[in-house]
Amino acid sequence: MPLLRVSSCTSRQGGKGTFGGKRSFAWTTRFAFLKQGDVKKRAVLNGQKIVVVMPAYNAEKTLRRTYQEVMAQDIVDLVIVVDDASHDETVAIARTLPHVQVEVHPENRGYGGNQKTCYHLALAAGADIVVMIHPDYQYTPSLLPAMASLVASGLYPCVLGSRILGGGALRGGMPLWKYVANRFLTLVENFLLGAKLSEYHTGYRAFARSLLERLPIERNSDDFVFDNQILAQVLWLGCPIGEVTCPARYLPEASSINFRRSLRYGLGCLATALEYRWAKNFGHSRLFPELLAQ
């Protein structure tokens, strides 16, 4: 059974953030158990359009398998694959899949740049809920109904699939050094951001349209730290973030970044958290503009 964890923080002005009538309180954590079969049967999707986005780079070995499991959930209206100048057959495979919109970057724009295209295309396609999942088959698509229903019901505008909840990261093959770095970064970020997330570094996340439209994602990096910056911006709004425990699979063909880029990512995460703290004290910053917290 997936474990649900909810973390939230207060807004910059010190008031309580709200979404769908639910108040978000600082340093609040709640737990609940969800039976996956029950979630599918009673998913409160309210006729909302569910769009899954996949930022892809050299994903020919795992794209089709990920797509098939995504569509097997029977809730997805459209899949958008954005290829970031792959050198393999990712684009050719994507174009053979039904209900898939394919966008190709002629030049590599980076992981963050790819996500910007993903979210813009999803909103342009009329998505009410946007779920990002990597096409490398690291994350299980079977959690899509649970994550989408939590957003559709108005409970949480952002839901993460966490590899840390339930202790599945190491069992799934996460390298020990990455696990230790993940835990250290999360500890520091929670302190600086005033939240209680189990991790900030998952590539499995669902957003409400109303939230995505408010986030200034064009200000964010085109590199991997984009993932961290967008979550910090969600917290800046005072919005609650839900987490669902997600089994992880570290396959040989799955995408990964080397130690050097991981180090740069970690430093970028710390810089983002420090900028957030600076903005809380002095009013606003480049990533956290004044209008975001109004």
Identify the residue ranges that each predicted region occupies.
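A conserved acidic beta->alpha catalytic loop
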Residues: 83-91
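Conserved short acidic donor-positioning loop in nucleotide-sugar-dependent glycosyltransferases
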Residues: 70, 84-85, 109, 118
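Short beta-strand-to-loop acidic/aromatic patch adjacent to the donor-nucleotide binding site
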Residues: 127-136
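Acceptor/aglycone-binding surface of glycosyltransferases and processive sugar-polymer synthases
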Residues: 107-124, 141-224, 251-260, 270
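Short, well-formed alpha-helical segments that are part of the catalytic scaffolds
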Residues: 58-72
